[in-house]
Amino acid sequence: MKNSKDYLKRVTADSPRLIPPKLPVGPLVVGGAEVFPGKRQKLDLPAARLPTGTMLSLPVTIINGKKPGPRLWLSAAIHGDELNGVDIIRRVTKALKPHRLSGSVIAVPVVNIFGLLEQSRYLPDRRDLNRAFPGSTRGSLASRLASLFMKEVVSQCTHGIDLHTAAIHRVNLPQIRANLEDPATYDVARAFGAPVMIHASIRDGSLRQAATKRNIPALVYEAGEALRFDEEAIQKGVDGIFRVMAYLEMYASTALSHPLDTQESRETRWVRASRGGIWHRSANLGDVVRHRQPLGFITDTFGDKPVQVRSPMEGVVIGHGQNPLVNQGDALVHVA
């Protein structure tokens, strides 16, 4: 077992800084719409038709600055039940002023429009859109939607932030997941200023993998729970995006709250139930826990025969299940 000091450290702002790329000023074309420097435009990007014949489209906001700079995409609701990012993007795009922007922003608050309508993580065929990238114009619905997003959004950008929440019946501490071995990505992750940033392996078919293959630094922001707005998670997301834009020299803001120190983690573990029963959790999001520290206990339905659940490592609680009814092997507490 590693000592926590080996993989958990404070991240400070005094490391060497990489110079972000700057794209020249000019019209930005998305879905055939031309957005000129100093302008903003909302458009509907046609995606696919429902069985009724109704066309479903991706809502896109393009903000094209008057000065050269990076191009940042913001995306949310790749999983249709993960809603915090929808409001994060609403707040960010409402606040941005094109005449103060260096570079441009392409924001898509709902990528999985089908899942959003059904309040579901998945597409109608039960596929996970975040396992379908980079997609194909001749593949499944998920593959076609991924291909459209890659062509119209990702391929035009220098950086990206994909906004998520925990899956249903779970909740996450605000955190950044990224490839921290890549210096450019590391610096952007640090600039975001989330309570925790995690070196996360790249999953096949994920948007982050597709962006990485194009050498685009991409962050995943995880915070809150499915089908709920969480004000703290939303505000930390908004602040983090503006900090990233300030780091990239895209946008200066004096209204940012001062970021907390970010804890960097290279290892995470889910603590799982050794038996079925009623789960009584004592550990909360953000708690710093010791190795073997009790996180709660499981009883039978009479409240008897308690079994202690302990942390397998030192670290911070970054997520936990919400359902007190557990089966053997269920995920209980996530420690980083």
Give residue ranges: language-model regions:
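Structured catalytic-domain cores with a bias toward divalent-metal coordination
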Residues: 1-336
